[in-house]
């Protein structure tokens, strides 16, 4: 729900008493935003609950429809409720955005740098600032024309000077414009993305002889400077490794005209060529390459490392090469401790462990410690291996005897504890005479009693008859007339009478229901007869 409609709905709820005179049945035809189902339901609610209660349902249903405020205002005017319509319209307009009345501003193109001259020339050129860093330019693409070329660089530079500014610019003796590095940096802002797009388009038509075929669109630039970034337009089919100095010859042929800018352009061309061709650097073991000749993408060091590259015979004295994209360590291989895994790169080559000072990478160091003595591997960590005890040999090497001895020695203490004399004693019992179905857990008072092997049924009594078990002691009055020793002071029975009175079973039989009714009837008759006899005696 928009903000204005939400505020209008809350205003109507707060001032609901002002809308009580709105007839729901009358206003429904003026609300086309409501569906037929909504209108039928509201009419039924108005018939059952009345008009006032139905107004709540009407506003609740309206606020779910888009644009309901305009429909409601028009419906109020149709029902001749102009005051309410104006009130709702004023509230609705007060919450409308302020800028919605005026048309939106036309879209303006993004602002351009202040140094940009008038309309661009037919072709866009490339230029590099003095610090070899490309500046930003507008994000929209620049028009590029590949086929049309100006007559001469002198005329193009003169036209660009006239369009840019009337100030005087020094010229070379041969007529070409000469600019400083600050002017070039201000007049040639180009992004790397723009260079990549235009390099791919201009690379197909550019040749080594066309050194000044394009003119800059942002000011006069010398032909040599404008040509420097186009060093990447050479064919990229040759991927063979070569020296780092083998850059495009056209990129360095114009270094005599402008030394500072040409060197920056040549460096940029070298970086582009190295990133595209990914040429590896090959250094001999005796000489070191200069630091500025290494590309930025090769994390190698200048120290000669006695390692062997992939698919190269393992001869550290004759060949010591470093792959261009494999990071190598600056420390010699002899400093690698024996307890660390070796580099997995030269894993499939036979390496002389005595010369290289390291074990082959196929054998883990943990296996070397167990199968090879420390004297055969002349590494720096050999003294460490001599101090530490050797790991136990595997069971396969000794026929499994060492593993069995270790396990037996570990369990020797536990076995001696379990077999102490006098703690655990075995007892031979008589064989069981019953069946397995009679087995059960029976309660025993003490552990020293002998086992009972009788059937379990003997421990229970039959429940064929009902009996009353008397377990209370006889009173002292019953024992006064009986001969014998006196009773106990606690009131207990005498020893002779213990069997008679301690437990006595009195059998009782359940009477039938007919006998009970007969006894009750006989008793009633006797009572009535007795009452009649007594009544007659009183009368006489």
UniProtKB/Swiss-Prot annotation:
Residues 10-77 form the CARD domain. The record marks 429-430, 490-491 as: Cleavage. Residues 145-165, 179-216, 317-331, 339-355, 373-382 have a biased composition (Polar residues). A motif (pLxIS motif) lies at residues 439-442. Changing residue 155 to D: No interaction with TRAF6. The record marks 148-149, 427-428, 508-509 as: (Microbial infection) Cleavage. The record marks 148 as: (Microbial infection) Cleavage by CV3B. Changing residue 461 to R: Abolished ubiquitination by TRIM31. Present in T-cells, monocytes, epithelial cells and hepatocytes (at protein level). Ubiquitously expressed, with highest levels in heart, skeletal muscle, liver, placenta and peripheral blood leukocytes. Pfam families: CARD_2. Residues 241-266, 388-403 have a biased composition (Low complexity). One of its GO terms (molecular function) is protein-macromolecule adaptor activity. Residues 153-158, 455-460 are annotated as: Interaction with TRAF6. There is a cross-link at residue 461 ((Microbial infection) Glycyl lysine isopeptide (Lys-Gly) (interchain with G-Cter in UFM1)). The chain crosses the membrane at residues 514-534. Changing residue 10 to R: Abolished ubiquitination by TRIM31. The modification Asymmetric dimethylarginine is found at residue 236. Changing residue 148 to A: Complete loss of cleavage by Seneca Valley virus protease 3C. GO terms for cellular component: mitochondrial membrane; mitochondrial outer membrane; mitochondrion; peroxisomal membrane; ubiquitin ligase complex. It is a single-pass membrane protein. Changing residue 325 to R: Abolished ubiquitination by TRIM21. Residues 95-297, 314-358, 373-419, 476-507 are annotated as: Disordered. This is Mitochondrial antiviral-signaling protein. It comes from Homo sapiens.
């Amino acid at each position: 729900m928009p903000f204005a409609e939400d505020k209008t709905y809350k205003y109507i709820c707060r001032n609901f008493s002002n809308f009580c005179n709105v007839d729901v049945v009358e206003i429904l035809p003026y609300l086309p935003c409501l569906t037929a189902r909504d209108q039928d339901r509201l009419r039924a609610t108005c018939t059952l609950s009345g008009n006032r209660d139905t107004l709540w349902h009407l506003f609740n249903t309206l606020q779910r429809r888009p644009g309901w405020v305009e429909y409601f205002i028009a419906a109020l005017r149709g029902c001749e409720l102009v005051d309410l319509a104006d009130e709702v319209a004023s509230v609705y307009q007060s919450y409308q955005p302020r800028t919605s009345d005026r048309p939106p501003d036309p879209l303006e193109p993004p602002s351009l740098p202040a140094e940009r001259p008038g309309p661009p020339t037919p072709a866009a050129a490339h230029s590099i600032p003095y610090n070899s860093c490309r500046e930003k330019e507008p994000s929209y693409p620049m028009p590029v024309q590949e086929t049309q070329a100006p007559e001469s660089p002198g005329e193009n530079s003169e036209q660009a000077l006239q369009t840019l500014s009337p100030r005087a610019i020094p010229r070379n003796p041969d007529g070409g414009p000469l600019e400083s590095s600050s002017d070039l940096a201000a007049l040639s802002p180009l992004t790397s993305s723009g260079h990549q797009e235009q390099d791919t388009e201009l690379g197909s038509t550019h040749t080594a002889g066309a050194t000044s075929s394009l003119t800059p669109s942002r000011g006069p630039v010398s032909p040599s400077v404008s040509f420097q970034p186009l060093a990447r337009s050479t064919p990229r089919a040759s991927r063979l490794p070569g020296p780092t100095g083998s850059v495009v010859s056209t990129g360095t042929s114009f270094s005599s005209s402008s030394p500072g800018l040409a060197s920056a352009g040549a460096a940029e061309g070298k970086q582009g060529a190295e990133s595209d061709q990914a040429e590896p650097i090959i250094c001999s073991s005796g000489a070191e390459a200069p630091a500025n000749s290494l590309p930025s993408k090769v994390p190698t060091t200048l120290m000669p490392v006695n390692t062997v590259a992939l698919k190269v015979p393992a001869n550290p004295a004759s060949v010591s090469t470093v792959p261009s994209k494999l990071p190598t360590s600056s420390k010699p291989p002899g400093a690698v401790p024996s307890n660390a895994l070796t580099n997995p790169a030269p894993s499939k080559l036979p390496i002389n462990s005595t010369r290289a000072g390291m074990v082959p990478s196929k054998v883990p160091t943990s296996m070397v410690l167990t199968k090879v003595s420390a004297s055969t591997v002349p590494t720096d960590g050999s003294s460490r291996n001599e101090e530490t005890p050797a790991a136990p040999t595997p069971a396969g090497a000794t026929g499994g005897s060492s593993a069995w001895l270790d396990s037996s020695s570990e369990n020797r203490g536990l076995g001696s504890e379990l077999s102490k004399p006098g703690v655990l004693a075995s007892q031979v019992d008589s064989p069981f005479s019953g069946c397995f179905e009679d087995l059960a857990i029976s309660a025993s008072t003490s552990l020293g009693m002998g086992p009972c092997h009788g059937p379990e049924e003997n421990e229970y009594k039959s429940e064929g008859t009902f009996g009353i078990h008397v377990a209370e002691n006889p009173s002292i009055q019953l024992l006064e007339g009986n001969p014998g020793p006196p009773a106990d002071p606690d009131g207990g029975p005498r020893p002779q009478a213990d069997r008679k009175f301690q437990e006595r079973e009195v059998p009782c039989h359940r009477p039938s229901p007919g006998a009970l009714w007969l006894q009750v009837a006989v008793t009633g008759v006797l009572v009535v007869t007795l009452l009649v006899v007594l009544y007659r005696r009183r009368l006489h």
